[in-house]
Amino acid sequence: MIELNLVKKHLNVDEEFTEDDAYLQVLIEAAVAHFESTTQRPLVQENPTDTAVVITREIEIGLLMLIGHWYNNRESVVIGGV
C-alpha cells in the first residue's frame, strides 16, 4: 500500500541503508492499521465500496507523517513543560 522506498525518501533515509527496513515495514503496517481502526474503514488501492476507502495522496501523506513521527520518536513524547 505504501512502499518502503517512499517511506525512506520521506524520512531522508538512504535506500542502501537496510538496517531499519523491517522496523519501517512494521511502522507502515501499524499506520495503516491505526487509520483503519480509527475510521472503522479499510484502506484499498482501488475499487472503493460503501465502507472501504481508496488511499488518496492526502491519506498517504498523513500516514507518512505518522510513520515519520513514530520513527523519530521511539518513546513517548511530551509537548510543553511543567
Language model region names:
Residues 1-82:
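Divalent metal-cofactor coordination and adjacent catalytic microenvironments
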